[in-house]
Design a protein with these regions (language model features):
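Extracellular, disulfide-bonded carbohydrate-recognition/adhesion ectodomains
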Residues: 1-155
Length: 155
């Protein structure tokens, strides 16, 4: 009986899907969507302090599941992800492994611009960090790294 009690406590401490309490399993990876707002570099340090890094979202199913989680749980605001083109303008890389971020749909936002359809990323040297943008229905957008958004961490 003592063994079963310890097992139950261990399962509750880790969570149903192997993620710690407050984290969610999406695609077999534990994601944490936090309410604190901070610039991108601080968000990265914040995630590293939780034993992970800013999230890599390189799969359309994971992007959809993150969107559904945000909507289902009534979260608001935009969320930092773990990619930037800080090293070389226009070369978007995930910080975890330096792999390239896929361009275009289904990841990056497209919206009506002054001269037709405007495709993200479009911010040039002023917008070098990747955000799940609330104003773009949680598609990828490039943003100024000094803006304050919520971190999405992964472990």
């Amino acid at each position: 009986m003592k063994w079963l009690t310890l097992l139950a406590v261990a399962i509750l401490a880790v969570g149903c899907h192997g993620c710690e309490s407050g984290w969610v399993d999406i695609g077999g990876v534990c994601f944490g969507l936090f309410t604190e707002s901070m610039p991108w570099a601080d968000a990265r340090t914040f995630c590293q302090g939780h034993g992970g890094d800013l999230a890599k979202v390189a799969d359309a199913d994971v992007l959809r599941d993150l969107y559904e989680y945000i909507i289902t749980y009534g979260l608001s605001g935009s969320f930092w992800l773990g990619a930037s083109d800080l090293t070389f303008e226009g070369d978007w890389l995930w910080v975890q492994d330096n792999s390239r971020v896929d361009r275009g749909t289904p990841f990056w936002a497209i919206h009506s611009g002054l001269f037709g359809w405007d495709h993200e990323p479009n911010g040039g040297t002023e917008e070098n960090c990747l955000v799940l943008d609330e104003t773009r229905k949680y598609y990828f957008n490039d943003a100024n790294c000094n803006l304050v958004f919520h971190p999405v961490c992964m472990v």
